[in-house]
Amino acid sequence: MRDPRYDALAELVLDHSLRLQAGEVLRIEGEAAAAAPLVVPLHREAIKRGAHAYTALDLSGLKEILVAQGSDEQLDFVSPIELRELDAIDASVTIWSETNTRSFTRLDTDRRQRQLTAQRQFAIRRRDRIASGEHRWCGTLSPTEGQAQDADMSLADYEDFVFRACHVLDDDPVDHWRQVGERLQARAEELGSVRELRIVGEDTDLTVVVEGRTWRAAYGRQNVPDGEVYTSPVETGVNGTIRFGFPAVFVGREIDDARLVLENGRVVAAEAVGGEDYLRSLLELDEGASGVGEIAFGLNYEIDRFTRNILFDEKIGGTMHMALGMGFEALGGQNRSALHLDLICDLRREGEVYADGELVWRSGQFLHETRPSELAARVR
């Protein structure tokens, strides 16, 4: 039986995220079996809009064969066909759905990281085309049994959670995300005038210099669901201690209850209840891996629980997250790394955030609303 929520999600991605027009070329990519419930309505709705849609679907297990059996040369290979293809398409949507979320757990971590590092060439090319306005991209998810199990939910409950977080059941989902954009853009502008943030919580007292950096509002253009404001901090301006109460899931492995000490923007001490050796290995991946590439506020309050999926977890309303490794060049970030490890700090119970010494956030909420500026009101 056809579920209208998948149709609504497809329409939101095409009309709000990608702003797809007649005559444009759209690539739909994902794991064939896992992504199929969303691939079909995306293709159907793209055709209705007069676009030229095609699919690039992977079979479960193929990447594992490459990581397990491939030579170093094969792990480093980036398809020139895919790179040329990227230059020829107007828009793409990636469906991050997996039938088995633990398929890489027992494979060699260094080999998997090597393969992912090579694929960054494709990601960088896509990022540059997005920045130039030549390409539009969005990442989203079609719920699977495996991802529901990770979230400790039944598939039906997980579907409800996902579609609620995406607001596809609202009377006008596109208008909802436009309004979110106005609010978050106003918040980003406000944070743009801040020199230093101080984050205080359980086992956490961290100062983050953000002076001169641009804050970005995330409201459904490149992720669905969305709901965060983020920036790249000054590379030498992060100092103190921070505890991440939620597990970090990276390449199928977990790091549980990580605690970091940072000095002048670098991790100088790290421990974790689970996965400590793995965390330390990631910090040594390259020169930039122990630096901070991102600091962000999670502001989607429909996402109210941890699900072991970073698309949702980094946006949990009332949290902040920090990413080790690669920063955002467009926002002023200068840290370079093959790593981008998101770590989530839960501030919903006792957390406080100070902006230049003034308390602006308590227990997962900003203390005052922002009023959309003329710039924010132009979010469309």
Q: Where are each of the predicted segments found?
A:
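Active-site bordering "gate/hinge" segments
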Residues: M1-G240, H368-R380
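Short, glycine-/Ser/Thr-/acidic-enriched flexible segments
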Residues: A33-A34, E98-N100, T144, T204, ...
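Short aromatic-centered micro-motifs
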Residues: I199, V261, V353
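Oxyanion-binding "anion nests"
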Residues: P225-A270
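A structural signal for short secondary-structure junctions
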Residues: E235-T236, V251-E254, V261-L262, D286-S290, ...
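Charge-rich, low-complexity intrinsically disordered segments
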Residues: T241, A248-E254, R259, S363-R380
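Dual-mode signal for accessory low-complexity, basic/Gly-rich regions
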Residues: A269-Q334, V353
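Internal helix-turn-beta structural module
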Residues: R308-V379
